[in-house]
Amino acid sequence: MTTYNIKSTVITNRDATPKVLTDAYVSGGNLAASQGYVQTFGAADAAGTIYRMCQVPSSARVESVKIQNDALATSAAVNVGVYWPTFIPVGAGLSTSVAATVINTALFASALSVVAAAKPTDITNSSGNNSIVNQELALWQACGLASDPGIDLDVCVSVSTAIQAQGYIGLKVTYAK
């Protein structure tokens, strides 16, 4: 077996000649957070229901995504992903037809059970879609967009298996900018 001395992107950039600047959202950036909560309606919350929880700048790198919830019945499950905002700012260079549509429905979590009440739980890569490599990228890149739209994107919880009880769901996204 051989031993190696392998460098991450940050260390490789530091050691390069000439030095390569690492984006502040990867090393040395400031952390910020956005959070929100909703109350479910109970039996009316069918698969496909979307809860718009918070907004994150498209150019930010997501540090963590934490969800907490009340017990929401016998088979309830949700996805946590990224959507276009419900309002596209004038001058953003985007068609208003993308407003409120999905970008990546399960970037952070897929079919996550919300049957039992849960304290804040980190789901940054619960789905397997937000891989270790993606976690060093800006949100727009991690979502698979071709370019940075330069606006805040919505982080949403979408119902994948009907929620049959009334209760609260909360989400907190910490990001570097």
Residue ranges and their predicted role:
Residues 2-177:
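Surface-exposed, low-hydrophobicity beta-strand/loop segments enriched in small/polar/acidic residues
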